[in-house]
Amino acid sequence: MKTDRHKYNNDTYYVGIDAGSVSLNAVVIDSKKELVFESDYKRHFGRLNQELYALVEMLFSRFGESDIRAIGFTGVHGQALSETLGVLYEFETISQVLGVLAVLPNVKTIISMGGQDSSLFQIKHGANGWELGHFNTNGPCASGTGSFIDQQAERLATAMYEKSKNISQDQIDRVLGDFIQLGLKSDNPASVACRCTVFTKSDMIHLQNKGERLEDIIYGLH
């Protein structure tokens, strides 16, 4: 495998991997705690082990296996992977807050939307540092999470492109981008139920059948 190590000074590196329900993402910091690398957003489509192996191989090639001092995991699949590999693990909620504060020390509100969880953190800052003022997350229902929005983008693809379209897994990112951009064209969001994804989907189908503009339906969903 071709190496890209010439891009980095000789140093020691620390890798954090978010093994989520939908995607696999990684960041690398150096000994000065400076961010030196962030991987592209990568959907694993259930092929978690294969995608993880490819990701780690790429990181070893780029930074040098001997120069990577530690690897840590977070995310839905992070704990199981960390136990299997004998490496560090941190709860995703803690990782999200500490990670954002490291990049934006004065942040007051953090919203995390994952494949199956959405979370809200409100941070209070004072003379003695920061503290968590409020936290909330969704329950067992996946309403308002990334997976449901993905599903609706795929479902509406035929209407969006005005022709029958079979969406491959590799095309979903482009479809999702078009889905979001179409919704941004609306200035009149349709009324869509926010209680549950079952009701939300039913409302969206009903609005389509009534002839509501697609961009208004998508904007209402968001």
Model-assigned labels for residue ranges:
Residues 2-33, 107-126, 196:
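Gly/Thr-rich phosphate-binding beta-strand-loop-beta motif of the actin/hexokinase/Hsp70
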Residues 27-30, 81-86, 119-126, 133-136, ...:
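Short acidic, glycine/serine/threonine-rich loops at helix termini
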Residues 50, 54, 98, 102, ...:
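Residues on a specific face of well-ordered alpha-helices
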Residues 47, 125, 131-184, 196:
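Glycine-rich phosphate-binding loop plus the immediately following alpha-helix
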Residues 40-44, 60-93, 121-122:
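Short beta-strand-loop/turn "lid" adjacent to the catalytic site in phosphate-handling enzymes
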Residues 43-45, 70-73, 87-98, 111-115, ...:
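Active-site nucleophile and cofactor-binding loops and adjacent substrate-binding regions
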Residues 11-54, 131-139:
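Short glycine-rich, Thr/Ser-proximal phosphate-binding strand/loop in the N-terminal lobe
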Residues 200-222:
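Adenine-nucleotide phosphate-binding core of ATP-dependent small-molecule kinases
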